[in-house]
Structure formats: C-alpha cells, structure tokens
C-alpha cells in the first residue's frame, strides 16, 4: 500500500531529509525561490479549510440555472487539496506524497505544516493565484455562471468574474470539485458554447 511504501522508504533511508536542498523551482523567469509563496498558500489554505469544513464538506451543493440546467456538486475531504494546488509530503525530502485528505485534516487540527513539506501541484505561478481566491471560493453563493470547459481535463466550470471551480463528473451524474482558477467564467469557457446564468444555489445533505 501507499502507507507501507512510505514506511519502507523511511526505514531504508533512516528517515533522513533533504533539508539542505533549497526550494528552487524553474519557471519562465528561471529559478525561483517560492518559500514565501508556499507560506502564503498554506496560510490561506488553513483559513479556507475551516470554511470548507463549515460550509461544504459532506454536503451537496445544487446549482439551478435560468435555462433549467441543474447540477449537484459533492464536496469530500479529499477534494480540498486539489483546490489549494498543493501536494503534501511525509517529510522535507518529498519522496513520499501523502493522500490529499491528509493536508485538509492536518490544517483542521491546527498542525504546523512546514513549507518544505508541500510543493505546487502543476505550474508554480498558479499557486499564488489559487491562494488569492481560495477563501472567497469557499462561498458557493457567489457562483453566478456555469460554462462548458475549454480545458479537456475539466468538464464544467462554476464561478464568477474573478474565480471558477473546475468540475469533474461522477458516474452517477453528480459533479465534484477538481480545481480552482483565478479566471473569469468567460476566460475558461469553451469557444462557441452557451453561458448558463445561475438562478439559485442550494445546500443539501448527501
């Protein structure tokens, strides 16, 4: 199992960490030290985790659009890390990635998480942008539009002029939160597709 692999690696390595390795990432501008960005992202993630727990976890948010499109979004503890854009690791060496729900659980427990134990999931530049809108995106009453995604990895986006949450589709026809972008609904909409205007947002139990 994943957990057993982690334990095996720790035993073999003696649990040593690569703390002497500087947190450098290579973006368009060359090597970038993003420790401060990760600290900012973690601070926003902590605030957002509390809101996610209070408003979303274990619930279904039903979005009703003016043209009769209706969709239900299911919110699970394991989805939170994807919205943050952070991968969470067992220790500073980042050789063993923890399950996504572990980041959410540790944030809720007020555990101190070192920036060395997280890394951006995807492009480094996305991390700060996600963090900028993360807490605001925990309020689904602010969703004004639903659009078909121009990104092949995402089915729909639900959002507004500032941010959008990317949605994946489950086998039973419901949706789940897959990503968060700091872009307007029009920027992420697939060219030539209809924009669905939201009429009401309803919170329900699963």
What are the residue ranges of the model-derived segments?
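Conserved binding-pocket/active-site segment within a compact domain
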Residues: 123-206
